[in-house]
Amino acid sequence: MRKIIINGGKQLTGEVAVSGAKNSVVALIPATILADDVVVLDGVPAISDVDSLVDIMETMGAKIKRYGETLEIDPCGVKDIPMPYGKINSLRASYYFYGSLLGRYGQATLGLPGGCDLGPRPIDLHLKAFEAMGASVSYEGDSMRLATNGKPLQGANIYMDTVSVGATINTIIAAAKANGRTVIENAAREPEIIDVATLLNNMGAHIRGAGTDVITIEGVKSLHGTRHQVIPDRIEAGTYIAMAAAIGRGIKVTNVLYEHLESFIAKLDEMGVRMTVEEDSIFVEEQERLKAVSIKTSPYPGFATDLQQPLTPLLLTAEGNGSLLDTIYEKRVNHVPELARMGANISTLGGKIVYSGPNQLSGAPVKATDLRAGAALVIAGLMAEGRTEITNIEFILRGYSNIIEKLTSLGADIQLVEE
């Protein structure tokens, strides 16, 4: 069993660089299947989700070279082979293979996607879009088959009943080579959607409106290879900014796009966090007294659900009472009892997280229950007096590139051990 051990209470200082966006790259890699030549992705994070996607792609027949933060993907040999089991089941983002395989072959048979347990996250919106474009859906045991019965996908007008990043991206991928025009209304607006659309447009697709709530895709016959720089990970950036405010003695977070973090930064300003925003970095000063705030998550450009948990340890340092309401994923509260185990005055009440501070945390054995809860526990461990042991760390390694090395470079006493 692997665990992360932190001896907390150290003041951190220095500079940390943000890696490429996890939530982009997990869609960009499957999207390369649509190309008829090599696609090169730069800025790819060193995370286990990428490792799993590379394994899946190679099983399908892709030839992939990986050097540093660059992936060179030759999708020409990809075959439409059924993949009902294996890594495809443990990876939430595996659903993007439905869009790419439908777009290339008109069919796909894959195991149902996994990932973090954050409450209901059905793929109904994805299936509704695929059906509108002419695909049929059937179930074979624990896998699902989509097929167009030998016909190409057809452009369609698609209204998303709820705002969904995954369904918006999957529809864009599937529609890129469909016959005719596809219009997505009530589309999600996240930066990662723009990133995927940029890759596809550079491959020869005709996509307009990414980043707005109406996206139009004019299908094309073929897509070619290209080179693409993955955008910085706004969630990783927010995580390190929150950590810097909680325990830092002057930390510069680089490779940051401020415009992707405006709602998050606004809440830090409300708390009284002192920081300097530069062109592609944010310098976070050592903090004094912070004020408790209340937060409600919402789709972009609102406060990101993925930043709710990493921000929580910083909130615990603030004076006063506050609350967190996650309107996106109702079960994103599993970090609360773990923080309480460390001495935090925090609980759940009527579906809302409530807290009171300031708190002095103490090291304790805790368990990461999902990716962002794991990030919260790492920050809490850095803040706490004494030794913190975090188990179930595979969740953390899914989404934070070289996290041990990055924190060590700032002065943290943190290590990954195997027992």
UniProtKB/Swiss-Prot annotation:
This is UDP-N-acetylglucosamine 1-carboxyvinyltransferase 1. It is found in: Cytoplasm. The gene is murA1. Its EC number is 2.5.1.7. The modification 2-(S-cysteinyl)pyruvic acid O-phosphothioketal is found at residue 116. Cell wall formation. Adds enolpyruvyl to UDP-N-acetylglucosamine. One of its GO terms (molecular function) is UDP-N-acetylglucosamine 1-carboxyvinyltransferase activity. It comes from Streptococcus agalactiae serotype V (strain ATCC BAA-611 / 2603 V/R). Keywords: Cell cycle, Cell division, Cell shape, Cell wall biogenesis/degradation, Cytoplasm, Peptidoglycan synthesis, Pyruvate, Transferase. Gene3D superfamilies: Enolpyruvate transferase domain (3.65.10.10). UDP-N-acetyl-alpha-D-glucosamine binds at residues 92, 121-125, 306, 328. InterPro entries: Enolpyruvate_Tfrase_dom, Enolpyruvate_Tfrase_sf, MurA_subfamily, RNA3'P_cycl/enolpyr_Trfase_a/b, UDP_GlcNAc_COvinyl_MurA. It catalyses: phosphoenolpyruvate + UDP-N-acetyl-alpha-D-glucosamine = UDP-N-acetyl-3-O-(1-carboxyvinyl)-alpha-D-glucosamine + phosphate. GO terms for biological process: cell division; cell wall organization; peptidoglycan biosynthetic process; regulation of cell shape; UDP-N-acetylgalactosamine biosynthetic process. Phosphoenolpyruvate binds at residues 22-23.
